[in-house]
Amino acid sequence: MHRRQIVLSIFLAALFVMASFPAVAQHDTSPLIGVMWNDVDRKILTKSIDKDEAVELLKQYEKPVKAFFRKMGGNEVRRNKWVFPLTNYSSISYRDEGNDFLLGDYDYFQGSNTKGHPAHDIMINDANKDLLDDSTGKPVDVVSMGSGVVVSVDTTWQPGSKLRGGKFVKIFDVTNSGIFYYSHLSKIFVYPGLIVNAGQKIGEVGRTGRKTILPGGKTHLHIGFLRSENGYPVPEEFIDDLRRSELKVK
C-alpha cells in the first residue's frame, strides 16, 4: 500500500473515531491521535473552530501523544541534545544575524494571519532561487531538532494560496513539551501520527508561502518552538539552542 493510501486510511479511521467516540482522544495511544491533532490544527488555521474549544482539545491530546511516543519506544532527547535542523548545506545565514525573533501580538489561534515573527529564518546558499544549494547542486535537508510525534502537516500549498507558511510540519516534542514548527518547505516526507527522532529527515528547504514565493523571497527554513503552557502553545526564543546545535556539525 502506498504512503498516501496509508495516510488516507488512517485519516478516515480517525474521522470515524472522532464521530463515534469523541472522548477517545484522552486515552488513545495510536497514530490516530496525531491525525486528530492535525484535524484540529487545520481548523485553527482556517478559523473554523472556537478558540476555547481548540485550546481544550490540544490540552487533551498532549497526554495520549506522549503515551503513544513512549509506548512505541521513541528516543527521548533533552533540550541540550537538540540537533541542528539543516543538513547537506554548504553555508547558511540567519536573518538579521539571528535577531529576527519578534513576539509582537502573536497568538497561536490567530490562524494563518498570525502577527509578529516568533521564530527564526535560516537562509541557505541559493542565489538563483532554484531550491538547490549553489555549491552542491542538491536540496538542503530539513531534519527534526528533537524527538516526538508529527501532529500537523500541510502538503497542499500551491502558488496563490493564502497560507502564510506554505508547506509545513509541526512536531510535538514529547520530552520538552512543545511544538516545533518547520515551514516554507519544498517537499515533506512525514505525515500526522508518525514518530520521528532527532536528526530524522522531515523535508527539504523551499520557498513556499504567501510572501516567500514572491520574487523577493529567499530560500530558507522558518523554524519556531512553542512551549506548551497547559496546552496553550507559547513561542519561545531559542536562538541559543540553534547556535549550540549548529556548532556540533562544524
Model-derived segments and spans:
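Zn2+-dependent peptidoglycan hydrolase active-site motif and core
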Residues: 136-139, 143-186, 216-220
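A generic structural motif
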Residues: 126, 154, 175, 186-189, ...
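Conserved, short, structured surface segments that act as functional micro-motifs
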Residues: 162-171, 194-250
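Polar/charged, compositionally biased leader and regulatory segments
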Residues: 24-141, 241-250
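Small beta-barrel nucleic-acid-binding modules, principally OB-folds
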Residues: 120-134, 178, 183-185, 225-235
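Short, well-structured beta-strand-loop connectors
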Residues: 141-153, 190-205
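Bacterial N-terminal signal peptides that target proteins for export
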Residues: 1-10
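Bacterial N-terminal signal peptides
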Residues: 9-19
